[in-house]
Amino acid sequence: MPLHPGLENAFKIAMAKTETDVAKLIAEGLLASPQMYANIALLAIRITGTGLAFRSSIGEHVWRDPSLYLNDEFLQRCNGLMVIMDHPETQVLTTEEFKNRAVGSVLLPYIKGDEVWGIAKIYDQDAISEILEGEVSTSPAVVFDQTAGNITLTTENGEPLLIEGVPFLLDHIAIVTKARGSKGVWDKGGDAAGVLLTNNEVSEND
């Protein structure tokens, strides 16, 4: 006889024995985010959005083709992706910036609607405390070379529109803090929504 869905979910949660098990439950929405596990916080974060967005810092519209990101190949590229606090001034992480900013890595990437999300393992306790205060989002560092196929057009208003191709490097995913305005490009002008904070039982003192 099949189990009642609620009972089946309770069994799944009870049988979670590893950080990967817990990460899968968060991704499925069966556990709230974040979850404290041993010395780490398991946290659902957006790796990238797709479609049309606006980079207000440089006045550029951008189109990120969903077909290039919402697939298994891109998810594989996200495995182990470095999680840092705020972007460095350099386009990619240097040794020094890695030492100063790295706080964890992506354990389990997955597709959520028209976005790519991942469960991150956050080790740095100061970073965990800052994240739990809220008003944070995410911003990916994707790097393009001459073979990427990027095309720049001009909108009717005379503003640049970048049609992105395939990035040759996915360097890191940054947690955008209050000090950097709390929002990422893929919030698309809305509220900061790149970090899922739904677990009211976890406080910065845990």
Region spans (language model):
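Signature of dsDNA virion morphogenesis modules
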Residues: 1-204
